[in-house]
Regions:
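Glycine-rich phosphate/pyrophosphate-handling loop used in enzymes and phosphotransfer proteins
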Residues: 3-218
């Protein structure tokens, strides 16, 4: 996979090229990396296997990540399988109830490994996973025909206070840094607090989120 070449699991203390200037933040990170690795040995966020650095996955978990590929639904990227219709056809669920979007760019299919990565970032505080996950997402984005706005879904202020960060905002900022659009952090507004969506089905989630997020009138 092309995105794996950009995400090697190298030692955190690897010597940088002398031709690249180091920012104070990068210098501090390089200095503290061996100490961080000593206190918190690098582990795969999906299975717990030892790693060479704090960022990345073990080889076995990389192999278990399923990147959507052709043939797949032209609307939601649901895989058809080898015996299904050709690439770009529309799947039965999308035909039965056309979604209100122009298309989905899925970084991976939902399985045990991808679920653990999302939970590690969202509820485990593993914010160092954001750049890696953003690269997976960016690799699946279609070419932009004009200016692309990257608008993260906001958290309610109390949820943001409890968690300390908005995972959607972290991913959006990394995607902007990769050159895939312009970040607009205030494009949406959270109007009310909602319960945790964990364990809810699609219908229950839609019911809970109805009216909870609106477009910023500004």
């Amino acid at each position: 996979l092309a995105m794996l070449e950009a995400l090697p699991c190298l030692p955190a203390w690897r010597k940088r090229s002398s031709t690249l200037p180091m920012t104070p933040h990068a210098l501090l990170a390089d200095t503290l990396s061996p100490l961080v690795d000593l206190i918190y040995p690098p582990r795969c966020p999906a299975c717990g296997a030892g790693l060479a650095s704090q960022v990345g996955l073990c080889a076995d978990c990389w192999d278990q990540l399923v990147i959507p590929s052709a043939p797949s639904c032209g609307t939601c990227q649901r895989p058809f399988g080898e015996s299904g219709p050709g690439d770009g056809a529309i799947c039965a669920p999308c035909l039965a109830k056309p979604p209100r979007h122009d298309g989905i760019a899925a970084a991976t299919l939902y399985n045990d490994v991808s679920r653990k990565l999302v939970l590690a970032l969202k509820h485990g505080g593993r914010i160092a996973l954001a750049p890696m996950l953003a690269r997976l997402m960016a690799a699946r984005l279609p070419p932009a025909t004009g200016e692309r706005l990257i608008i993260p879904v906001p958290l309610h202020r109390w949820r943001l206070w409890q968690r300390g960060f908005n995972q959607a905002g972290l991913l959006a900022r990394e995607i902007e840094r990769l050159g895939h659009g312009r970040l607009m952090v205030d494009g949406l507004i959270r109007t009310r607090r909602t319960p945790s969506l964990g364990g809810m089905g699609a219908k229950a989630r839609r019911r809970v989120l109805l009216g909870a997020v609106t477009v910023n009138p500004r």
